[in-house]
């Protein structure tokens, strides 16, 4: 790799495309490579099987599902910046690996810095959302505030965030974004390599196989240990992990094992579709490969040498 004290290498692609295997392979060839996680679901230490966490690297499993703190793009950017500074200080090569589109988009283009929300406000609103449900929660807020319903997300996690910001600042999330400053990690250069399989059927087959393997390897026990501790579990972001809600429904005897597997697989396939749409529409100029072995070969021969 050419001399660059603050250079970044990124390896991305949809779920089950082979990113982790490529990252592990190239890190074995180059002792200087340090893997940094860029997957928003692989940060929870209680769910390594369900989220297919890598066995090595930074920012994997470093948070707990029982923490009141809910990670965001901004918090990942701060943590990633700290990791990068640490790797650069040791003359290492950071390899950021993951498929969370907003993490990668913010890494490339920067992020709007929004004010931090008080934990007490988030706890209060989260309890209201639990008691009223998404529709009742939003309708109650709209009735009290007189705000336009269409200005708030229908997704429960984003809805909670949007309402919290409005109550705390008196402004909508859109207004805050327009008024905020942009933070960008100060690297010298960045190389982005993506694995974008053209054979969707093959990708979906791998997704199905991986979720089934996770179910058979302990993912059910992982989710059970989380949902059984209802008093401590308040992190809504965890419930958005593909397969989590389906397994939780199975544990409540609401669906059969076979139905749970099918629903979990479908959830992950739909997520992969959204990832592919992001890569197609938002990430111009990246070096994309159809097969993981081609991406590995390019990294080893064109970037690391």
From Swiss-Prot:
Region described as Interaction with substrate tRNA: 39-42
What InterPro entries does its record include? Dimethylallyltransferase, IPT, P-loop_NTPase
Per the record, the GO terms for biological process are: tRNA modification
* Gene Ontology MF, one: ATP binding
Q: Which UniProt keywords apply?
A: ATP-binding, Magnesium, Nucleotide-binding, Transferase, tRNA processing
Check the record and name the SUPFAM superfamilies matching this protein: P-loop containing nucleoside triphosphate hydrolases
- Write out the transmembrane intervals: none
What is catalyzed by this enzyme? adenosine(37) in tRNA + dimethylallyl diphosphate = N(6)-dimethylallyladenosine(37) in tRNA + diphosphate
Record carries keyword Transmembrane: no
Report the EC number(s), separated by commas if there are several: 2.5.1.75
Binding of ATP: at which residues?
A: 13-20
Family indicated by similarity = Belongs to the IPP transferase family.
Please explain the role this protein plays, according to its UniProt record: Catalyzes the transfer of a dimethylallyl group onto the adenine at position 37 in tRNAs that read codons beginning with uridine, leading to the formation of N6-(dimethylallyl)adenosine (i(6)A).
Q: How is the subunit organization of this protein annotated in UniProt?
A: Monomer.
**The protein's name in its UniProt record:** tRNA dimethylallyltransferase
Q: What is the lineage of its organism?
A: Bacteria, Pseudomonadati, Pseudomonadota, Alphaproteobacteria, Rickettsiales
């Amino acid at each position: 790799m050419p001399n660059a004290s603050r250079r970044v290498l990124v390896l991305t692609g949809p779920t089950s495309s082979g990113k982790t295997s490529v990252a592990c392979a190239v890190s074995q060839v180059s002792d200087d490579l340090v893997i940094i996680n860029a997957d928003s679901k692989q940060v929870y230490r209680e769910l390594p099987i369900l989220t297919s966490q890598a066995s090595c690297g930074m920012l994997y499993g470093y948070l707990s599902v029982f923490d009141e703190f809910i990670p965001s793009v901004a918090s990942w950017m701060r943590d990633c910046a700290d990791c990068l500074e640490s790797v650069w200080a040791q003359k290492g090569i950071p390899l950021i690996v993951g498929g969370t589109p907003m993490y990668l988009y913010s890494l490339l283009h920067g992020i709007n810095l929004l004010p931090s929300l008080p934990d007490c406000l988030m706890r209060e609103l989260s309890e209201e959302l639990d008691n009223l449900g998404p529709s009742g929660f939003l309708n109650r807020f709209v009735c009290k505030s007189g705000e336009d319903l269409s200005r708030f997300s229908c997704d429960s996690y984003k809805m909670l965030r949007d309402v919290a910001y409005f109550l705390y600042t008196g402004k909508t999330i859109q207004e805050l974004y327009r008024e905020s400053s942009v933070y960008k990690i100060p690297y010298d250069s960045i190389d982005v390599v993506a694995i974008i399989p053209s054979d969707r059927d093959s990708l979906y087959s791998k997704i199905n196989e991986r979720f089934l393997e996770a179910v058979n390897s302990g993912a059910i026990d992982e989710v059970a240990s989380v949902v059984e501790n209802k008093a401590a579990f308040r992190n809504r972001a965890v419930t958005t992990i593909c397969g989590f809600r389906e397994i939780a429904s199975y544990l409540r005897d609401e669906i059969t094992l076979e139905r749970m597997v099918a629903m979990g697989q479908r959830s992950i396939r739909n997520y992969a579709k959204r990832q592919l749409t992001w890569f197609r529409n938002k990430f111009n100029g990246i070096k994309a490969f159809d097969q993981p072995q081609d991406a590995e070969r390019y990294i080893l021969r064109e970037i690391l040498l």
